[in-house]
C-alpha cells in the first residue's frame, strides 16, 4: 500500500517543515483529460478511502488509514489549515487540494492525536446533499431474464429522493402499513466529482470522484402498482450508501467487480458487475446528454440476479424481508455495507 496510503497524523510543531506547497497538492489531484478551457480545476484527491461521519447535528469528513480514521476537522483545526468540513463540501466545492495539503502535513509528523478507532465511528451516508439520486433499472442481463423483463434498448432511469439516504450500520423502518414485499438490491454506486454534460463514453469515468457500495432497497408491491417505480423505491432510508467512498483511481475497472448480498448470513446474490447491459461509461454518457450531472450526484447502476422479486414461485409464497433481518451488501474493494430492518 505504501506510505502514501498510511494517512497518519502530525503535530502543529511539525507543520512548517511538513506541509506540502499548494502547487504540489494540486499536481496530485485528478484532472479529466477533457477539461474545457477556463474550467475550474477538478478538486478530488487521488488514492484515498473517504467517509462521512455523524457529529452532533452535522457531518464530518474522515480518511480511512491503516491505523483508524483521520479526523479531518480536528487535524485541520489543530494545524491551522483550511479543510473541507464534510464529503459534500469536498465534492461540491472542489476542496481536494486543501485535503491533500493536510494529509501531506500529517503524514510527515505523526503523533496519533487525530486518528479515531474505526469501531467507534458513527457513519453517515457517503453523500448527504446530492442534487440528484439517479437509479438504473434492469441493468444486468441475468436479472432482466430472471424477472421476465425484455432486455432494455436504452437505460431505464428513475430516481430516489434525499429522504431515502441511509448509512452503514443504519436501520430501515419498514413502511408495513403500505407494503409487505420488501427486497434487497446490492449495487455499485458512482459518485460525481465534477460537472458533467454531453460527455463521450471515452471520457465519462474522468468525471467521477469515486465509487461506493449501495443498496436499492425496494417495496415490490408498491413498485408494481403502476408503470412508475418511484413509489416503491424512495421510502425513508431506502438508499443505504457506504461505508466508504473509494476514489476513482483506485478502481481499475468498475465493470469487473465481484458483488455479493447476504441476508442473516446467507448468500443471496453472488455475481459480477461485468454482467451489466449498459456499462458505467455508457450510463454516464447517456445521462449527461439528458441532464447536467453535478459534483455530489450519485448514480446507482443496477443489481444482478438473485433478488426475491425474481424467484420462480408465487409472490405470496416468497420469503420477503421482514423486521429483524440484517442485510449485508459487498462490492469488491469498496467495503461492506450493513443495515438492519425494524
Task: Indicate residue ranges for each PLM-predicted region.
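Short, structured patches in soluble enzyme cores that scaffold and shape functional sites
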Residues: 138, 160-162, 169, 176, ...
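Catalytic-pocket segment enriched in acidic/His residues
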Residues: 34, 38-41, 143, 173, ...
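Residue "hotspots" at secondary-structure boundaries inside conserved domains
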Residues: 125-126, 132, 180-182, 285, ...
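N-terminal non-catalytic cap/leader segment that marks the start of a structured domain
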Residues: 4, 11, 25-155, 326
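Short acidic-glycine loop/turn motifs at beta-strand connectors
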Residues: 56, 63-68, 192-194, 264-265, ...
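A generic local secondary-structure boundary/capping motif
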Residues: 38-41, 49-51, 123-125, 145-148, ...
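Structural signature of FAD isoalloxazine-binding scaffolds in flavoprotein oxidoreductases
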Residues: 150-168, 184, 323-332
Amino acid at each position: 500500500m505504501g506510505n502514501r496510503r498510511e494517512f497518519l497524523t502530525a503535530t502543529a510543531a511539525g507543520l512548517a517543515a511538513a506541509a506540502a506547497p499548494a502547487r504540489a497538492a494540486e499536481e496530485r489531484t485528478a484532472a479529466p483529460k477533457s477539461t474545457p478551457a477556463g474550467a475550474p480545476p477538478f478538486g478530488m484527491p487521488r488514492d484515498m478511502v473517504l467517509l462521512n461521519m455523524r457529529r452532533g447535528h452535522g457531518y464530518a469528513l474522515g480518511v480511512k488509514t491503516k491505523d483508524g480514521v483521520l479526523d479531518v476537522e480536528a487535524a485541520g483545526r489543530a494545524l491551522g489549515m483550511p479543510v473541507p468540513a464534510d464529503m459534500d463540501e469536498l465534492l461540491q466545492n472542489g476542496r481536494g487540494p486543501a485535503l491533500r495539503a493536510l494529509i501531506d502535513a500529517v503524514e510527515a509528523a505523526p503523533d496519533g492525536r487525530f486518528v479515531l478507532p474505526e469501531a467507534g465511528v458513527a457513519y453517515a451516508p457517503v453523500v448527504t446533499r446530492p442534487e440528484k439520486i439517479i437509479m438504473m433499472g434492469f441493468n444486468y442481463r441475468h436479472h432482466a431474464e430472471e424477472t421476465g423483463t425484455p432486455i432494455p434498448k436504452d437505460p431505464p432511469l428513475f430516481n430516489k429522493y434525499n429522504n431515502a439516504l441511509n448509512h452503514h450500520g443504519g436501520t430501515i423502518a419498514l413502511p408495513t402499513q403500505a407494503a409487505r414485499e420488501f427486497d434487497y438490491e446490492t449495487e455499485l454506486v458512482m459518485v460525481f466529482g465534477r460537472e458533467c454534460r454531453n460527455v463521450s463514453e471515452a471520457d465519462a469515468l474522468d468525471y467521477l470522484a469515486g465509487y461506493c457500495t449501495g443498496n436499492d432497497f425496494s417495496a415490490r408491491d408498491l413498485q408494481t402498482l403502476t408503470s412508475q417505480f418511484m413509489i416503491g423505491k424512495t421510502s425513508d432510508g431506502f438508499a443505504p450508501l457506504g461505508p466508504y467512498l473509494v476514489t476513482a483511481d483506485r478502481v481499475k475497472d468498475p465493470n469487473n467487480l465481484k458483488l455479493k448480498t447476504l441476508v442473516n448470513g446467507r448468500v443471496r446474490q453472488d455475481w459480477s458487475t461485468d454482467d451489466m447491459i449498459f456499462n458505467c461509461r455508457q450510463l454516464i454518457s447517456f445521462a449527461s446528454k439528458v441532464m447536467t450531472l453535478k459534483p455530489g450526484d450519485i448514480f446507482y447502476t443496477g443489481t444482478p440476479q438473485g433478488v426475491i422479486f425474481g424467484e420462480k414461485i408465487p409472490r405470496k409464497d416468497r420469503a420477503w424481508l421482514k423486521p429483524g433481518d440484517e442485510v449485508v451488501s459487498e462490492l469488491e474493494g469498496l467495503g461492506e455495507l450493513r443495515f438492519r430492518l425494524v
